[in-house]
């Protein structure tokens, strides 16, 4: 993931056992929609726990906090998010700003 965004979004997902593959497909569709329809969306990753395969963490980079907030207010965003959440027992979301950047 490029660290070009000035704002970051994350999701902590606990997917119902047996629904993991469908969740990955729905999340991918949600993020493809986001990248096509939400100005300022930069890049996203979804990682999965190796110890508990029903736990996922998503991280998205945004050009600005305003772009992220505009996306959150889009009616279709709530619909697409709902498709993912329907497969989860727990979901939390967070907003972040860049604190440090390292890399090669």
Predicted regions and their residues:
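Glycine-rich beta-strand-turn "strand-cap" elements at beta-sheet edges
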Residues: 1-6, 43-54, 80-104
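Short, well-ordered beta-strand segments in beta-rich or mixed alpha/beta enzyme
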Residues: 6-14, 43-72
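Short flexible/disordered coil segments
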Residues: 11, 72-74, 99-104
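Short, surface-exposed ligand-recognition loops at beta-strand->loop->(often short) alpha-helix junctions
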Residues: 14-25
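Non-catalytic surface loops within mature trypsin-like serine protease
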Residues: 15-17, 64, 97-100
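An amphipathic, aromatic/His-enriched active-site/gating alpha helix that lines ligand/cofactor pockets
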Residues: 29-42, 61-95
